[in-house]
Amino acid sequence: MPWTKNDYPDSWKNLKKTEREKAIEIGNALLKEGYPEDRAIPIATSKAEEWYKNHHAA
């Protein structure tokens, strides 16, 4: 089931809003590619944090 801005894994609750939105985008793409949720969540988390760091550097 795809994740939305209102329905996403508990582990994403503490991400910044833009990080969480990116994690949802990445996670949904991984699910569409056939990744199971238990693998898609940590991959999407890591990639979203990396994306945020690269796009919001001071």
What annotation goes with each model-predicted range?
Residues M1-A58:
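C-terminal alpha-helical interaction appendages
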